[in-house]
């Protein structure tokens, strides 16, 4: 049996805002409910989070998931290419809380505007801001607590086949 459950949400984006918000709420609540089983480890992963963070109460829900996940043997992964949406004034408080509650952050290349938005969410030194703008594919900063570690992510052929 496949231990993964995935939801394709592409069709949601052709729906009205109200319907899209309701569907997103149902999926997030259902998914989070599966993560509350303390007898097993789980991962709650939201990819392309910038596409849904501004919908309805999504930011507040995801903030609570990030804050509470460790209590339930859960790791929460929120991935985005657009820190701008997390820094939007409508969700900035929740966006900051998600970043500040995260045990680990992996920051890859961003353009200047993306770096500026990221600094609204988490503290970066001038050197880190410059470095993030110059990263090549696979380069990143791993933030673990107060430690900042430059890393390079290499994908093997087997890994690429698995995710492609």
Locate each region found by the language model.
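Structural flexibility/helix-modulation signal
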Residues: 1-8, 15
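Short, solvent-exposed loop/turn segments at the edges of secondary structure
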Residues: 2, 100-101, 135-137
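Conserved P-loop NTPase motor cores
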Residues: 10-131, 157
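Conserved RecA-like P-loop NTPase ATPase core
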Residues: 7, 69, 142
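Conserved P-loop NTPase
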Residues: 124-164
